Amino acid sequence: MMRKFFLGILLVASMGILSGCLVTDNHDEYERQQFRSTEEISEISVTDSSTNYTLQVSDTEELLVEYSDSPTQSWYNIDVADGTLKIEKTQGTVGVEENSVIITLPEKEYQSIAIETSNGDITFENVFSDKYKCSVENGDITGTLNGSEADYLIVVKTENGDSNLKDNVIESSKRIEFNVENGDIDISFTK
C-alpha cells in the first residue's frame, strides 16, 4: 500500500514537472540589442506584452531602440517604413529580467504615438506628439508630455486605478487616449 502511495506521488510530481516544461519558454539567455535608424519618422506603433516602455527624446538625428532579445531567435519585429516605426513582439518573454524597451527619438513633434502592452509600464520623457493612443492591462502610464494639457482632447479610462488626467472634451486635432485596466495614469505637461 505504501509503495502505491509513493508511486502515485511520483507520478503526480512527474506530470507537474513535465507540464511546467511544456507551458513555459526558457528565456534564460538573452542580450540587450539595439536598432538604429536615420530614416525620418512621424509615427510610432507598438504592439507588445509583458514589457516596460520608455520613450525619450535626444538632440540627435538618429532613432535608437534598446531592447532584450534572444541571441538565436528574435522575439521582435522592428522596422521603419513609410515614416512609421513599428515594433511588434512575436513571442512571449516570461523569465527575462531586463524586459524593457527604451525608444530614444530625435527631438521634434510627432504625428502619432500608439502603444499597446499587457503587463508593463509606459513612461514618457518630454515627448511631443499630436496624438497619443496607449493601452495597458496591468501597468501604469506616467511621465511628462511636451506641450499644454489644454490643447488636447483627452479621453482617459482607468478600471482599477487612479488618474491625474481628466477627460477634456474640446474641438482639437490633438488627442490623448489612455486606457489602463489595473494601474494608474500620472502625466504632467511642460507648459
Regions found by a protein language model. Give the residues of each.
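Positively charged n-region of N-terminal signal peptides that target proteins for export
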Residues: M1-F5, I9
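Repetitive beta-strand solenoid architecture
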Residues: E40, S49, D59, A81, ...
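Secondary-structure transition/turn motif
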Residues: S70, E88-N99
